[in-house]
């Protein structure tokens, strides 16, 4: 089946994105050769100006800077992306949406491409990245941890030291979760477009609101989430 992905780099909600990081990640996204790349500046900030001067397409939707219109909407990246795509791509030309957080450190172009590999399974609705976690990170509630089941026979062709897996749980507090091992989740996502719309319609779970744990919404509603285990980090 032919796919037509779009990469969306989101400017942080507070508008306090690092202009250099936004520009660099836009350049890596372009180098990946996946398809259309836009910077979603739904806050109407100036953080993406450096990338714009370098040739990036910065999309400032009509609702830029407006607060959510209903009491169940959150500041989650998925809702922001879905809301902007509803106008930017209202005819659904793009069937895969790759959401890259602008505050991430520099990453290799092949890493962005690799996030789509779990979607080769037609029952996986979206995918993300996980990396080995340090002891300090494991104890920090600021970091989302993932429990995964690795598919031993599935590897990512563009990244030799990586494996395809399926996520079985997300948590911030290991003390309240089941047995590990745990991995650090990296906030890059590849959504099937229909699954993204469904994800947003579900609305946040109580646990998501309490722990700021957006990916939990998918598992709580029976959506399968794939993962790519990066053993070499984002700059692989």
Task: Report each predicted region and the residues it spans.
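N-terminal glycine-rich phosphate-binding loop and ensuing alpha1 helix
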Residues: 2-42
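Conserved donor sugar-nucleotide recognition element shared by glycan-biosynthetic enzymes
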Residues: 18, 47, 74-78
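Conserved beta-loop-beta/alpha segment of the NTase-like Rossmann-fold superfamily
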Residues: 65-143
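Conserved alpha/beta core of the MobA/IspD/sugar-nucleotide pyrophosphorylase nucleotidyltransferase superfamily
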Residues: 180-236
């Amino acid at each position: 089946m032919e796919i037509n992905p779009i990469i969306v780099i989101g400017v942080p909600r507070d508008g306090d994105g690092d202009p250099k990081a936004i520009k660099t990640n836009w350049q890596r996204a372009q180098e990946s050769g996946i398809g259309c790349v836009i910077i979603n500046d739904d806050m109407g900030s100036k953080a993406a100006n450096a990338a714009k001067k370098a040739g990036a397409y910065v999309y400032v939707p009509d609702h830029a800077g407006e607060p959510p219109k209903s009491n169940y909407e959150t500041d989650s990246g998925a809702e922001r992306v879905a809301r902007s795509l509803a106008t930017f791509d209202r005819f659904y030309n793009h069937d895969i949406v790759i959401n890259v957080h602008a505050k991430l450190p520099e990453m290799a172009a092949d890493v962005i491409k690799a996030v789509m590999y779990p979607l080769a399974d037609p029952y996986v609705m979206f995918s993300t990245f996980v990396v080995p976690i340090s002891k300090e990170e494991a104890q920090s509630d600021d970091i989302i941890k993932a429990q995964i089941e690795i598919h031993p026979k599935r590897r990512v062709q563009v990244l030799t030291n990586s494996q395809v897996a399926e996520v079985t749980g997300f948590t911030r507090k290991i003390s309240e979760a089941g047995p590990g091992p745990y991995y650090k989740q990296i906030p890059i996502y590849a959504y099937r477009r229909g699954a993204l719309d469904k994800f947003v319609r579900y609305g946040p779970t109580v646990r998501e609101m309490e722990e700021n744990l957006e990916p939990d919404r998918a598992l709580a509603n029976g959506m399968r989430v794939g993962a790519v285990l990066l053993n070499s980090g984002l700059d692989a």
